[in-house]
Amino acid sequence: MVEPGQDLLLAALSESGISPNDLFDVDGGDAGLATPTPPSVQQSVPLSALELGLETEAAVPVKQEPEPMSTPALLNVRQPPSTTTFVLNQINQLPTLGSTIVMTKTPPATTNRQTITLTKFIQTTANTRPSVSAPAVRNAMPAAPSKDQVQLKDLLKNNSLNELMKLKPPANIAQPVATAATDVSNGAVKKESSNKEVARIWINDMKMRSFSPTMKVPVVKEEDEPEEEDEEEMGHAETYAEYMPIKLKIGLRHPDAVVETSSLSSVTPPDVWYKTSISEETIDNGWLSALQLEAVTYAAQQHETFLPNGDRAGFLIGDGAGVGKGRTIAGIIYENYLLSRKRALWFSVSNDLKYDAERDLRDIGAKNILVHSLNKFKYGKISSKHNGSVKKGVIFATYSSLIGESQSGGKYKTRLKQLLHWCGDDFDGVIVFDECHKAKNLCPVGSSKPTKTGLAVLELQNKLPKARVVYASATGASEPRNMAYMNRLGIWGEGTPFREFSDFIQAVERRGVGAMEIVAMDMKLRGMYIARQLSFTGVTFKIEEVLLSQSYVKMYNKAVKLWVIARERFQQAADLIDAEQRMKKSMWGQFWSAHQRFFKYLCIASKVKRVVQLAREEIKNGKCVVIGLQSTGEARTLEALEEGGGELNDFVSTAKGVLQSLIEKHFPAPDRKKLYSLLGIDLTAPSNNSSPRDSPCKENKIKKRKGEEITREAKKARKVGGLTGSSSDDSGSESVSDNDESDYESSKNMSSGDDDDFNPFRDESSEDNEDDPWLIRKDHKKSKDKKKKKSIDPDSIQSALLASGLGSKRPSFSSAPVISPASNSAPANSNSNSNSSLVTSQDAVERAQQMKKDLLDKLEKLAEDLPPNTLDELIDELGGPENVAEMTGRKGRVVSNDDGSISYESRSELDVPVEILNITEKQRFMDGDKNIAIISEAASSGISLQADRRAKNQRRRVHMTLELPWSADRAIQQFGRTHRSNQVTAPEYVFLISELAGEQRFASIVAKRLEGLGALTHGDRRATESRDLSRFNFDNKYGRNALEIVMKSIVNLDSPMVSPPPDYPGEFFKDVRQGLIGVGLINVEDRSGILTLDKDYNNIGKFLNRILGMEVHQQNALFQYFADTLTAVVQNAKKSGRYDMGILDLGSGDEKVRKSDVKKFLTPGYSTSGHVELYTISVERGMSWEEATKIWAELTGPDDGFYLSLQIRNNKKTAILVKEVNPKKKLFLIYRPNTGKQLKLEIYADLKKKYKKVVSDDALVHWLDQYNSSADTCTHAYWRGNCKKASLGLVCEIGLRCRTYYVLCGSVLSVWTKVEGVLASVSGTNVKMQIVRLRTEDGQRIVGLIIPANCVSPLVNLLSTSDQSQQLAVQQKQLWQQHHPQSITNLSNL
């Protein structure tokens, strides 16, 4: 029975998502060691845990009422608290622990407030270490309850929650009685944390914790107790499995080895009942391989079913690069064409891929299907005469062209209307969304709106409900947000567990890594998803470290200093001229975008010499080279060309250009004289014709929006106009411009909420070569969105300024030509006012002008050392354009002529138009005319450069990357250019990495992924070291959490979790603080000088980009500090049992996995009724004496063999078997009798402290004893004689040799909400959904959800008594059979 008032607290906590049952789990390290008799310890936990705004400095001892059984011992407390300690704990379980809740009223010296403490009693161990002498104080006499003690229920009745929180403690709390626990030599007592530490630990805990259903009892750790970390499930041995179609036996084998993730391979797809119409010739000649035919068949089969809302079901192809998605799609279109569905739509990311689409259709024997480009049609009916009367075939379009619109009006003035008319209302043909993850975000993050492209894709599907939709994306089901417009998969919506897409996203993202695996498996199970990847067997890679020369480091550090000065000047100038908020936002957006690109260019430039060297060597060895770049730096070249009047005297420094362009265009200092002379205005002449209405304009004439010259702007717009769509400069790792047609509207809509570095097209002025999208691409519809301008006399100067976006109606800089409402009613200023304002603003502007000039002068000095454009330098060093095939988005290049002069030339050739230049260059490379190819990321999507059996050039490809993306998925996508099906030889990959921040780490993460896919490293130099480096990927919640701790510790908001790098010369925190101020991640308050963190301070991407702007030794030390903190965060999470390991692997190591029971349940589904199975699995992980002696017999090292612990506990010793695995570092592998092979390696020095070497006979008794008892006795009971958890009737599995798991498999998605309901009701809302992969002894693979033991019976009841769902499933099955009479024979085994 809940006492009155308790419901207040419970409600408050449940709102915070905290389960009262689990509020204060005590970690093993936190409990003090107590007296030899089993006492109960009182522990108070600080209120800051509840994030209720109060702070505390120590735990508070509380008097307790006498108990019949045990004697209390108090926890050691060093100092009285400064604030209320208020602990809510296990209200409904307290009586079972024999505890009493008391409130002490202490006579206060300075205050009349009450002290409230709610405590929890914890029983601790009965055994002290033998080395500790018996304590002098055996027991502290418990005080009888005094008059001052008040029961909690009375307290809760009389106070509101708010009042309880305000109560202050008295100043004079007595020191607690000392016990053996105060003996520091014990090593088990944790030091009191400071209030900041406690707050941090609790806040992080709340973020990460998974609440367990049962009360956790503390494990008291002794100093020398061997750590038995239960990490057995961490083995991720086999991630990928060989793939062959299971249910379909037609077609020839695929030319290359293909793999599938092992979780997907554990699921079998549905039976095939659909018969394809594709000709025997196509199949027998292998034009479509067996696995491509399988995808075509399943897609066609899925298209025969309808979702509950009446739409036709869609199919998702998740094949990776090189498996032949193009041919599979062509096969689906061909299949439907043969069935008289002769119209199809194919959307992709680049117009160049149209040629690939034509090739794929031709290759499978569908020569008669024509492919038309949407952008080549005029607006109007596609089937009309002026569009060539196109009645059938495939219309190929890019996503961005979907939102195209004609200014001339008419019935079909948008591309979408054209397509809808061409298809017709009853359209049941194929719509393919290729690379659909690139179609801009429909499900935006934060405050931004969905993009027009995303909405158009959705509208197209909604308007054509009978269309056969195919989604194709290599990252299809790995990123749930990318699935926003895959509404035809039937995962969310009517008749599914998730009503809306947002419900699905919440459920999946809340459940972590494994949830998407469950979704993918469920989709494969239902026949709507297929995902294979090319095996990387045969591929080799090496990591080539490029050492930075002293002169390079010097130059880099100079550049860093210049950027720090630039940041200060930009800030000062903006303050001087009182820049408007919107202008500042735009300015900083541009500043950080330029900052990121500048340092990326410097990083790449450091590797050019080495690349050239390696490339020449490989060519000599008879191989050919592909060099991958992210960006081309074209915009910089064009600017330099214009400044030199079309003449160049040297290669252009891209890095210099970035900073120069930033200062010239975006420094807040208008060049007034130039502007007015250009407009023909005499500043000194008084304006005669200005009416009172216009007088405010006088002072404003002087102001303009940004310091650009209007004519130069217009001139440049004309000049650069043709380059708008090019992917030239900003295909950087976070750029939005993935598409060949940059979708300005969409990009402006994207994440408008904040100025992060990643979107160069965000702010009012666009990037680089698109100086102003409005000037280049006049888009009349956009002007409708702008606020209505106040009518202005067209002859006035102001209107000229406004028209060119340079005027403003306010005496401050406006970043956009929008007039604020305030200016409409502004009173006319008097002349004197106007003049004085003119003088001060002129003075400020002149000072800003001077700053701008100084910055440009400093840049010129530095420019002598800055490296030239990487791409031009590479081409020049490797023999010029005649030897190098360039596949990038740029239109021209800088070349050195025979006479040594430098000139700019267009890339286009006489007989080759610019549009197909890249395809021509690719052909030259594939034909062997050129043996070196340089590709930029944007231009290369979909281009195949492998050593194809059909190509003339069959030399082995060596693919070099100068810039690794820090996401392994993106890297694998890049490598898909040279590693594809039907190749003679697999490529070699070379990662060039410098010693700049974290490049080594990126490389090792990518290397680890490649190894998982079957690639080999050159030599074994990396075998041990880099595995440690890549052990934890950092773009996850632990990475963000570690970064938060790092940043807070640097500004003293938090105490550091790890010590700074020992080899750092100087004061680490002080230097790094200055460095981070310089890159804008720490802000300094103007007046107070207080340091504050940037609002995105825990954004990993931003952090990694920004720290490149710190001096070399600083950024490396900071990255090392971050990596160390991350390791500590992960270790802590593991120790507290809250580490989200993603997917657990059982049975891939030495464990023996057996199925002991299985229960099946029918579940409803829209196409077929599915079923779920609940397996009872027993896992045996120990090592018998026979197995141990077998390993022992093979050991050769001097220190290998059996060891016994020096310490005796409960009259027992620990026996272990030790094997040396790394002689250089003296690392040893340990085997234990109860838990088998340990994942954690031990250093020899640590081993010697705890163990001594013995002969095998001495170890035998101890080994057998622990092996036999661990079958059913946990570690605590074995070493201490009792286990507190077991004594409370709870299950304890720590150290058990045999464990039991309950795993729910099958169509889990259809019962997801039921499972969540049961888990939440038993275990609280934040229970972690743990996915497990099992491989049983008989070779069966099982992947599913672990169900906690205490949730099994309610779940079984729910699933089995759900008669309604079973009946519904049977009805659906019958209905389905009526729709598909031809398939009844095939359904008997469904």
From Swiss-Prot:
Belongs to the SBNO family. Highly expressed in brain and testis. Expressed in the hippocampus, olfactory bulb, and cerebellum. Low expression detected in lung, heart, liver, skin, colon and kidney. The modification Phosphoserine is found at residues 146, 160, 212, 690-691, 695, 751-752, 765, 791, 812, 1383. Residues 840-867 form a coiled coil. It holds the Pfam family Helicase_C_4. Plays a crucial role in the regulation of neural stem cells (NSCs) proliferation. Enhances the phosphorylation of GSK3B through the PI3K-Akt signaling pathway, thereby upregulating the Wnt/beta-catenin signaling pathway and promoting the proliferation of NSCs. Improves ischemic stroke recovery while inhibiting neuroinflammation through small extracellular vesicles (sEVs)-mediated mechanism. Enhances the secretion of sEVs from NSCs, which in turn inhibit both the MAPK and NF-kappaB pathways in microglia. Residues 726-736, 814-837 have a biased composition (Low complexity). This is Protein strawberry notch homolog 1. Keywords: Acetylation, Coiled coil, Inflammatory response, Nucleus, Phosphoprotein, Wnt signaling pathway. One of its GO terms (cellular component) is nucleus. Residues 695-714 have a biased composition (Basic and acidic residues). It comes from the Eukaryota. The gene is Sbno1.
